[in-house]
Structure formats: C-alpha cells, structure tokens
Amino acid sequence: MKKEIVGMLLAGGEGKRLGQLTRKLAKPAVYFGGKYRIIDFPLSNCTNSGIDTVGVLTQYEPLALNGHIGIGSPWDLDRRHGGVTVLPPYIEKQGGSWYKGTADAIYQNRYYIEQYDPEYVLILSGDHIYKMDYDRMISHHKKLGADATISVIEVPWEEASRFGIMNTNEEMTITQFEEKPTTPISNLASMGIYIFNWSVLKSYLIQDAKQANSSHDFGKDIIPKMLAKDLKLVAYPFEGYWKDVGTIKSYWEANMDLLDEHSSLMLNDPSWRIYSVNRNQPPQYISTRAYVRCSLVNEGCVVHGNVEQSILFPGVHIGANSSVFESVLMPNVKVGENVVLRRTIIMEGACIPSGTHLAPSDPDDILVIDKDTEFSPSIAANQ
C-alpha cells in the first residue's frame, strides 16, 4: 500500500554520557517526565502529525524498548497497513552487520521503505525531548521544492560544537554545513530531523554504502555530499522547546523544566498529547503527614513525607519524615523514613534505607543511584 511519507526513527543509541541510566537500556528507552520514556515524544509527534507508518531502528540493549513499543497501540500505530515496525540490524543472504552509522541504518532497511513506495522519508532521532508538528515541516519542504530539509534551532554559541552547524541565505537554503565543528560558523544547529525525497536519498545511500572510507553518517557524509552536488537543501526553523538529553545534567534539567510553569514544555496540552503505555496502577495516596509542592506525582505513589520540585514515577513510596528536593524517582522506588534526597536521580526499583542522606558533593552536580548501590547511613558522592 503506497504511503506519501514513511517515518524512520533512529532508536539504537547507547547514550554513553548518561552513564548508569543507559547501562542496561537504549537511550530512547530511558524514563522521563514521571510516566514516559524518551521515545514517546517522537512517536507521539508522528501520531499527532498524521504520520501512520513508522519504522523504529533498534540496536543497543533493545529488550525494554521492544517491550514498550509492542504493536504500537498507545500511539494508534497498531495498523494492518503501516503502523509501527521495530527494525533490528538487517541480515541479508550475503551477510550483515551492526549499523555502521545513521545513514547505514537507513540503507540496511531500505526494503522496508520501498514496500510503501513513498515520495518522502522523515528521519528522526529517538533521544530528544520536544513537541513538533512534522506536517508543517513537510509542507515547508514541498513549498520550497527541496531535495532535503533539515529542522534547525539556534543553540548557545558555547554548545554549537556539539551539533551539525549550518549557514543559510534569506530563502533558508543551506549554503554551508559542518558536523560538530571545532570552530562553529554559526549557532544554527541541526536537530537531527530530516525530510528527504526518497528517490534522491536512496541513490545517495547506495553510493555511500560502496565507499569503505565513509563513516556512513548523515551529518558527516550524506548532507555534505548533497551540498557538493548543488542539491537544494533547506532549513526549517523550529522555535519550540527542544532538548538533547545526552548528559545526566541535561536529562535532569529537562525533567525540572516540566515543573516550571513558564516552560514551553507542557504535558497537559490536549491538542498535542504525549502518549505512552498505561501502567494501570491505583490512584496516588498523599497522607495527612505529607507535604507536596511543585511536583509531578504519578499513579500508584504513596507519600508520607515531603516532596518539593521533584518527579515521582508510578509506584514510588516515600516514608514518614523523609524529604525529597529537586529529584527524579523512577518507577517502584522505595524511600524509607527520615531520608533526605537532594538533586538525585533514583533508578527503577531502588530501595533507599531509612536514615540515608543523598546529595552530590558538588551542589551543581546530579547524583545517580541505582538498585545495586550499597548504602551507609550518610552518603555524598560526585557524579
């Protein structure tokens, strides 16, 4: 069945800078915002944008991600024609390998795309937090008659070297592009969101696959080669909330942004919902001894202590006389009595013994605790 556009969501990233958070999980599977995983954001964006055919390309530690996505029901992607399909590295008769880069991941799954004979392919990263109407970007691509469109956002100059950076003319045509430059030419950064005319992209992927010296990456190889051949590449400016949660600090900051009433990242917008798997837990219980302020407290939580500027995932238990400040507690965390937590991320299923005090030794850092951590009565550590 022909589709005008197919979405390809790159979700195999290891996320090394997230340390313990991705030790057993792919980065897109990391919990976020009290009831979600990071991948819920691009999947929900697809649903809200009317894109009903999405391939999710997995690789590193895919088990949790596969189980979470399932047949795609939460995102209305459980369809006979299209829907969501999980795509591990592709093994052909001639052999196969792990994905060598972002472009190679798409190349290995070109037959998945070709079965829908699309005009366009939307390439997405599965590890960013944002809400975006891809349909507007598609309209921008068509209106300008582009071969490829890159969604862009202005970033602080001091962070520009972490991104693909470009210059454009007044018509938003891209004139220069550098992947993670030492000395950036601008602060206009690629968001890792691309729309390509499929016939054009396919030819470049086939050429790139034959080149042994290529890194098989969109930013390092495909985009520069298209520019060199004078194809029409245009930028699509995005002005909403977007966060690359690639470090512990940025991940924590994005969670805290949800608690800022002035933030543009709002989860209670009925016109643009973020969908996820429903855990079907009982309602939260806040006891008469509890004090909760400026926090997200989800279903199944039991709170007997103080919770301020924090996010509690489903099934979290906070004991009496305990205080939680500026922290993120993942599902089924148990906090004993007389515990103090400050700027701490507690991973799924961890139990914090009564009397424990947890905080980073540097007040600007974030402490991460997993379920295997051994405790003394008082702990302070660097992260």
UniProtKB/Swiss-Prot annotation:
Alpha-D-glucose 1-phosphate binds at Y99, G164, E179, K180, S190. GO terms for biological process: glycogen biosynthetic process. Pfam families: Hexapep_GlmU, NTP_transferase. It catalyses: alpha-D-glucose 1-phosphate + ATP + H(+) = ADP-alpha-D-glucose + diphosphate. It is an enzyme of class 2 (transferase). Pathway: Glycan biosynthesis; glycogen biosynthesis. Its EC number is 2.7.7.27. Keywords: ATP-binding, Carbohydrate metabolism, Glycogen biosynthesis, Glycogen metabolism, Nucleotide-binding, Nucleotidyltransferase, Transferase. The keyword Hydrolase does not apply. InterPro entries: ADP-Glc_PPase (IPR011831), ADP_Glu_pyroP_CS (IPR005836), GlgC_bac (IPR023049), GlmU/GlgC-like_hexapep (IPR056818), NTP_transferase_dom (IPR005835), Nucleotide-diphossugar_trans (IPR029044), Trimer_LpxA-like_sf (IPR011004). PROSITE patterns: ADP_GLC_PYROPHOSPH_1, ADP_GLC_PYROPHOSPH_2, ADP_GLC_PYROPHOSPH_3. GO terms for molecular function: ATP binding; glucose-1-phosphate adenylyltransferase activity. Belongs to the bacterial/plant glucose-1-phosphate adenylyltransferase family. Involved in the biosynthesis of ADP-glucose, a building block required for the elongation reactions to produce glycogen. Catalyzes the reaction between ATP and alpha-D-glucose 1-phosphate (G1P) to produce pyrophosphate and ADP-Glc. HAMAP family: GlgC. Homotetramer. This is Glucose-1-phosphate adenylyltransferase. It comes from Halalkalibacterium halodurans (strain ATCC BAA-125 / DSM 18197 / FERM 7344 / JCM 9153 / C-125) (Bacillus halodurans). The gene is glgC.
